[in-house]
Amino acid sequence: MMSFFPLLLVGILFPAVQAKQLTKCALSHELNDLAGYRDITLPEWLCIIFHISGYDTQAIVKNSDHKEYGLFQINDKDFCESSTTVQSRNICDISCDKLLDDDLTDDIMCVKKILDIKGIDYWLAHKPLCSDKLEQWYCEAQ
């Protein structure tokens, strides 16, 4: 029983890495570099991200032929490289795992590439949910 105690102590003191659940206003601050890029406003981004990942940096959605990763749900078929997709185009030249961390710098760089190639319609939530009536997506700090 004594040999189990140190393991238990380590488990308590160093919990597993958990998803960073951001708030709307915290995320608004993190997305300053993206605001206005390709004429997409910050409230539009906050709305899109809420609907696709719930502001969860470690969100992964499994589809029939690919997975989508992180806040922006970037797919491993075209934009990032994962161990589960055999032939990713990896346009963003990034591991999908990097899209699950709390550093959004590389995520935003990839998002800009996606916008340049596919436009905002890459995010299916935009048109039906986030293209107008965006009052609720403004943060008081904006």
Swiss-Prot record:
Keywords: Calcium, Disulfide bond, Lactose biosynthesis, Metal-binding, Milk protein, Secreted, Signal
A Pfam family annotated for this UniProt entry: Lys
Region forming the signal peptide: 1-19
Metal-binding found in the keyword field: yes
Disulfide bond annotation, renumbered to this chain: C25-C139, C47-C130, C80-C96, C92-C110
GO cellular component: extracellular region; protein-containing complex
Biological process terms in GO annotation: defense response to Gram-negative bacterium; defense response to Gram-positive bacterium; lactose biosynthetic process
Subunit annotation: Lactose synthase (LS) is a heterodimer of a catalytic component, beta1,4-galactosyltransferase (beta4Gal-T1) and a regulatory component, alpha-lactalbumin (LA).
Family: Belongs to the glycosyl hydrolase 22 family.
Protein's UniProt name: Alpha-lactalbumin
